[in-house]
């Protein structure tokens, strides 16, 4: 591949920014300064250094985030902070984007990547990738509600939801903690399904997306690359 593309893929900047780095003689390939971005390199076998530091080539990156409330799942927004504002600028330069979306007031697992093919597989309605949410609900969820979820909730606008699983973890006189397993992703779906049962979601967290589980050691707003095991589980999830 071309050296300038390799450097751009490594997050060193746009093609024009990379051109400036080359012109400034800050890039070496196998010990020799290279100023021409058209030079062909093999990132697997050639030693490419930027200011003396070895560059690790990764075409695709995969990041798990524990998304906090108050941040939108978008690449840009004129009113609110986005999830990209919370990650290393190096990933931003690699063109990562959130896979799907969590509402601004929902927190929990969010995957970010620049792998469009994987994102498409995870979001495709045909794949029915299961996502698990935990919700704190104002009101007492009942076994009758669980049966309605299993049958398929009809939303207030007449939209029919696919059958879903509702697990009631605990209840008090006026509140419930539940987990909801969904295989689709309609707008505000969890909140609307609970509302159809006459209750209100007051806190919502996503725990899983397919085989990927939220790392509980991640604080809100923190992120980390996926482990090889996590990545392989996503790649093999059909």
Where are these predicted regions, by residue range?
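Basic, flexible Lys/Arg- and Gly-enriched helix-loop patches that mediate nucleic-acid binding at interfaces
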Residues: 1-238
